[in-house]
């Protein structure tokens, strides 16, 4: 029997879903604390930071400073994760309000660091395994599973390899064991994540690692549904797309950040890919029945000229992505693009505004295409007093939209899980739907 300490923990997990998995590992080590969302009441405030781009760094720093103001006398303030790792040599002096700093190598030792009240930065990047106890947050039916850590790509704009290191993939058996354990606890929907998911097992000399994973999950039959985030174009193949299409468990969800479509820009970005390869993959994805395609674009990378931008803009309007993330270029230390001549901010902002207009048009069309037809969905939890929150099974949590189901139209309360529903109305990125039946 686990006995709770009479101490409260406030955990703030910033950044991506990969960071969230590491935060959940830390929660697993700190299971004997009572969780609170109020930093002023906490005995320990733990902030798992993001250090990806400038806006994320600023958010992390501001969150730390706010927590420092809120913390009560005697409380411990901890900054872990990417920001701490990336700036470990100077961060202790820059933010003296923090009691403990730790990076990306010691999530599974957080209880020891708190007990000893010491900083620690291990050289080896931590990669969660099946034996690392996690406390899953946010859902009783969905969990993220991290399949690898680090990245071997050499994109001109990305600093991640400088603090996350080279690609290190988990053993397939470890992933299957984690999936089985989580499924037995009721997590029947999972999202598989990594910095570069399509390169899974490349570091172990296997080029079809992600296909192996898909087929092993299908054979295992522990899950009802799953999807994969963060495919990298140069390591994505037609065979991989086919494996996803053929899977009874993995949804026809394709999240592949292309960053640009112009060949000259892809070369400047050091993406190790080409427009022809992008189009081959994207058109194959679009041919898959009921496919859902998400991508990411960087606007204003150094040396992006008007012609290259117009080529990108025309392509995005023609291809019609279901969802599109558009980022302004962020100059990051220890990257090739950091010292290159910058595109003026005024031009970047104008370009982003134009692309956002295109993205919103096609996003709304994607939502409306679901109206008045049965779709498979995951009901996650009650949202407020009158609604249940759900999402299309193809969608990733949090980022692709939400569906609300009015409980006044139900004869019995809904349990979290898989249902067939019919969306009937759409407004402000939200679909309203009725439940037909569970499946």
From Swiss-Prot:
Enzyme class, UniProt record, top EC level: transferase
EC number: 2.8.4.4
Single annotated GO MF: 4 iron, 4 sulfur cluster binding
Database matches in InterPro entries: Elp3/MiaA/NifB-like_rSAM, Methylthiotransferase, Methylthiotransferase_CS, Methylthiotransferase_N, Methylthiotransferase_N_sf, Ribosomal_uS12_MeSTrfase_RimO, rSAM, rSAM_horseshoe
Subcellular localization, as worded in the UniProt entry: Cytoplasm
Reaction(s) catalysed (UniProt annotation): L-aspartate(89)-[ribosomal protein uS12]-hydrogen + (sulfur carrier)-SH + AH2 + 2 S-adenosyl-L-methionine = 3-methylsulfanyl-L-aspartate(89)-[ribosomal protein uS12]-hydrogen + (sulfur carrier)-H + 5'-deoxyadenosine + L-methionine + A + S-adenosyl-L-homocysteine + 2 H(+)
List of residues binding [4Fe-4S] cluster 2: 151, 155, 158
GO cellular component, one term: cytosol
Keyword field: 4Fe-4S, Cytoplasm, Iron, Iron-sulfur, Metal-binding, S-adenosyl-L-methionine, Transferase
Cofactor detail note: Binds 2 [4Fe-4S] clusters. One cluster is coordinated with 3 cysteines and an exchangeable S-adenosyl-L-methionine.
Sequence ranges assigned to domain Radical SAM core in this UniProt record: 137-368
Domain MTTase N-terminal: 7-119
Listed GO biological process terms: tRNA modification
Function of the molecule: Catalyzes the methylthiolation of an aspartic acid residue of ribosomal protein uS12.
Recorded family membership: Belongs to the methylthiotransferase family. RimO subfamily.
NCBIfam families found in the cross-reference section: 30S ribosomal protein S12 methylthiotransferase RimO, MiaB/RimO family radical SAM methylthiotransferase
Protein name: Ribosomal protein uS12 methylthiotransferase RimO
Origin species: Helicobacter pylori (strain J99 / ATCC 700824)
